[in-house]
Amino acid sequence: MKKPQRGYARQDRVKEQIMRELAELVRTGLKDPRAGFITINEVEITRDYSHATVFYTVLNQDTREITEEVLEHARGHLRSELSKRIKLFKIPELHFKYDESLERGMSLSALIDQVAAEKPVED
C-alpha cells in the first residue's frame, strides 16, 4: 500500500534546514574580513544527500571574487559546523555557486523598460 503524500517532502525540509543553518554560519561564523555581505538564496541537494550546491549573492559586486575564495576556503569548516547542527546520516559536500538570476532578472527588466519606452503609446 502506498503511503499518503505529505505536502512537504523530506528533501525539501533538509534543503531549507541547510539553507537556514548556512545563512547563520556565514553571518556569524566567517571570520575573514574580506568576505562581503553574503546572502544564501537557494540550496540544491542530490537525492543521496552527498552534494549540495549553495547559490549565493553578495551586496557589493566588487567583493564577488574574494567572497568566492573565502567560501571555498571555509567549505570544510562550514560542513563541519553543519554536522554539529543538523542530524543527517551524511552531511553533503558543499559547492558554492554565485547566483546570477538576480542580475539576469534586472537586465531583462531593463530591456522590457527600454522596449516599452521606444514603442509609441496608442489610444
UniProtKB/Swiss-Prot annotation:
HAMAP family registered for this protein in UniProt: RbfA
BP GO annotations: maturation of SSU-rRNA
Stored Pfam families: RBFA
Name of the protein in its database record: Ribosome-binding factor A
UniProt gene name: rbfA
Cell compartments where the protein resides: Cytoplasm
Keyword Cytoplasm: yes
Family classification: Belongs to the RbfA family.
Described purpose of this protein according to its UniProt entry: One of several proteins that assist in the late maturation steps of the functional core of the 30S ribosomal subunit. Associates with free 30S ribosomal subunits (but not with 30S subunits that are part of 70S ribosomes or polysomes). Required for efficient processing of 16S rRNA. May interact with the 5'-terminal helix region of 16S rRNA.
GO cellular component terms attached to this protein's record: cytosol
Principal location class: cytoplasm
Record note on quaternary structure: Monomer. Binds 30S ribosomal subunits, but not 50S ribosomal subunits or 70S ribosomes.
Listed PANTHER family: RIBOSOME-BINDING FACTOR A, CHLOROPLASTIC-RELATED (PTHR33515:SF1)
Keyword set, alphabetical order: Cytoplasm, Ribosome biogenesis
InterPro entries per the UniProt record, alphabetical: KH_dom-like_a/b (IPR015946), RbfA (IPR000238), RbfA_dom_sf (IPR023799), Ribosome-bd_factorA_CS (IPR020053)
Alphabetical list of NCBIfam families matching this protein: rbfA
GO MF, one example: ribosomal small subunit binding
